[in-house]
């Protein structure tokens, strides 16, 4: 799956 690194990883800060 080719996606943005920001979207691939879960929201740590949940911002």
Swiss-Prot record:
UniProt keyword annotation of Iron present: no
Assigned GO CC terms: extracellular region
Disulfide bridge positions per record: none
Keywords: Disulfide bond, Neurotoxin, Presynaptic neurotoxin, Secreted, Toxin
Entry's family note: Belongs to the venom Kunitz-type family.
Subunit structure: Heterodimer; disulfide-linked. The A chains have phospholipase A2 activity and the B chains show homology with the basic protease inhibitors.
Name of the protein: Kunitz-type serine protease inhibitor homolog T1-2 B chain
Organism this protein belongs to: Bungarus candidus (Malayan krait)
Lineage: Eukaryota, Metazoa, Chordata, Craniata, Vertebrata
């Amino acid at each position: 799956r080719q996606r943005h690194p920001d979207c691939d990883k879960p929201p740590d800060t949940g911002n």
